[in-house]
Amino acid sequence: MKRLLAVLVGVLLAACNADDTISRAYRCSFLFDTSLHPLPCHLTSILGNSGHFCKVQTYVDNKGVRHLKTTRNYDDATEDISLTTQRETQVAFYLGANDCIIIGVSSYEIGKLVAYDGQCPNCLADYTGINYPLTWQNNGQLLHCAKCDRSYDVNSGIRSRGDAGNHDRLLTYNAFFDGTILRAWN
């Protein structure tokens, strides 16, 4: 009887989906140690500031060094961050559909950290390929897709302009900051 009860509880727990708004279509695994990159680093400076977001892209240079390229929403300033410490070089980065995520603090819910895929969810669903980048618009409060002309509110992730399409919101990832490590994942 105890075994049957344990199996039933396990099945019920496995069937539950605590947060079905988290996208799992494209892998997201991002870790950033703010103690290694103090202010004025863009990613460190957005934390605790409602309405501040960064677009984060990754690439490896010709010397094999991984870099993060960030673009802030409120002034379009860019920064190139080299990840050179032993701890950083051992982390694998997966940034959604096309190596780009948007991460920041929503101004709608004080202190709520959010992360989105940097590609248009409707174009990812409607077309082949993965290169449908979102760009800052309206002083960084909207993310716009040039392909389908849809715009999304960066604070909520909800479509604010354009046809409804298949997705009314951006592809969303978990986001958390523990005081030192900034994470986004699915």
Predicted regions and their residues:
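N-terminal pre-ligand scaffold of iron-sulfur
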Residues: 20-135, 174-186
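Sec-dependent signal peptide recognition
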Residues: 1-7
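Short Cys/His-rich metal-coordination motifs, predominantly Zn2+-binding knuckles/fingers
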Residues: 123, 148-149
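Polybasic, low-complexity binding patches
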Residues: 137-143, 151-185
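C-terminal motif of bacterial Sec signal peptides marking the signal peptidase cleavage site
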Residues: 12-15
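A general structural-boundary detector
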Residues: 3, 106-107, 162
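Flanking scaffold residues of small Cys/His-coordinated metal-binding clusters
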Residues: 8, 112-115, 139-140, 170
